[in-house]
Design a protein with these regions (language model features):
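Short, Lys/Arg-enriched N-terminal segments with co-localized hydrophobic residues
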Residues: 2-20
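Surface/interface-facing alpha-helical segments and adjacent flexible terminal/loop regions used
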Residues: 15-196
Length: 196
């Protein structure tokens, strides 16, 4: 785990096959300072208190995993059409995300023999969300995105949970990321908007 990152189970935690397409735990290139800067910005965005206080994201370890997954998905969608440097940064950021998850599972005292199985499950959850959110976002379907967020963030809810506010923020965030230049992406300086 990179110095300066906090484990999933800690207060204000940074969470840290379909593929470990990104070469999970593979060799790094020379972008580490850029990657660390962008990763910190993304994890900070995922910890904005408004998500947990106003937009119905549970302030729990899994709630924060869900929020960071959403932020990572937004960044991945922005960089999918970027040049080589942007795609390399995205690859290393997703690697860092899963490394933090692995570290956090071990910090919680999970036995080494079960970590790979749990990692595989969490990776599957992440890529499942990537597909579900993309289906709604590609068609600008806010209601569909809100429904997908309810299924993933509140799978056991006994009463309806309104996730339209988070869905609306994700569309605003996607537009915000698209407005940022390739140079900003390559420098690891992309930002996400505050919750209105």
């Amino acid at each position: 785990m990179q110095q300066g990152r906090t484990p999933l189970g800690a207060q204000n935690e940074a969470f840290p096959e379909k593929t470990m397409i990104f070469g999970l735990f593979g060799k790094k290139n020379n972008n580490q300072v850029i990657v660390d800067r962008q990763y910190q910005a993304l994890t900070s965005a995922a910890r904005m208190p408004e998500f947990y206080e106003r937009l119905n994201v549970p302030d729990t370890v899994m709630g924060r995993f869900e929020m960071l997954s959403a932020v990572m998905i937004l960044f991945f969608r922005r960089t999918r059409t970027s040049g080589t440097s942007g795609q390399e940064i995205a690859q290393e950021i997703v690697d860092a995300f899963f490394q933090d998850i692995d570290y956090s599972i071990r910090e919680l005292g999970i036995g080494d023999n079960t970590v790979p199985k749990r990692m595989k499950k969490l990776a599957g959850m992440f890529y499942g969300r990537l597909e579900a959110y993309a289906k709604a976002m590609d068609t600008r379907d806010a209601e569909g995105l809100a429904a997908a967020l309810v299924r993933n963030i509140h799978p056991k809810a006994n009463e309806p949970v309104d996730m339209r506010g988070l869905a609306d923020w994700m569309f605003v965030a996607e537009d915000h990321l698209l407005s940022q230049s390739e140079d900003v992406i390559a420098r690891g300086s992309a930002t996400l908007p505050k919750v209105a």
